[in-house]
Amino acid sequence: CVRAHLMIYELQDGSPDYPTLVSRNRPDGRPIGWGAISGMVADAEAPGILYAVNDSFYGMQPTIFRIDANQSPAAITDAIPVTRAGAPAQKLDLEGIALDGDGGFFLASEGRPGRMIPHGIYHVNAEGGIEDEIAWPKALRAVARRWASEGITRVGSTLWIAIQREFDDDPAGFVKLLSYDLESEAWGVVHYPKEPTETGWIGLSEITAHDGFLYIIERDNQIGRAARVKRLYRVALEGLAPVAIGEEPPVVEKELVRDLLPDLTRWNGYAVDKIEGFAVDAAGEAFVSTDNDGVDDSSGETHFWSIGDL
């Protein structure tokens, strides 16, 4: 565990490598505050334009951030508050975001029953106002644990949600990918096989649909030299056949796309643990981001970078 570190700098000519993500001022001159970036999604038409949500560290300020990655460093140019009846929405832990195809978004919230935060999906308009709430079915809530929704993506009329770690009814090493049909309101599930680990735990932290595949971030919870698994996998949508909640889920086949650990160490610091955002823009360029936990018990660094075209 890295409890403290010393950073050494050398003055030289050239462009700085860090920060990789900054924010612009609002029209009234006030800065846009941000942190704890979690799930991401790309604008459907404008290359380099992304949207991201913050998680429960800013529980009183759930926000959708607009990111312009066409500049260096990438810049947060707008912050859209998530509201319920005109006030900042409470009892949310936003971990995923998907476009709804009509200018709004679907947001995945990771529940925490002990704090009265429900598991669910929220449909918001372009201004961030909650228009609909999709609750988890009773059979799913009955087996859920704290480490739940960690990404959401839309494929036509189906939403796919990545679950971070095993629920009570999952065998060790397998986690759920949930499906929700917006037309029939039917839930489904498949099993995703995780990598083995001897230290800490491994879970999923993002899911993004692109060009016939579901791209999934799989990571351990280790930092520095202990970090081993920070990877991007993909699962083919063709042949994916979810079954009803409570039935035996089929196991999907995954394919390694990229080891992200070398990316995390290219800034010459220690590898942070929380890769939580992945999006592919309208031009096919893929972007990755990390969650800085709102600088609490963290180095405070947010890394945002492109891995090029998929």
Provide a role label for each language-model segment.
Residues 1-310:
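Sequence/structural signature of beta-propeller domains
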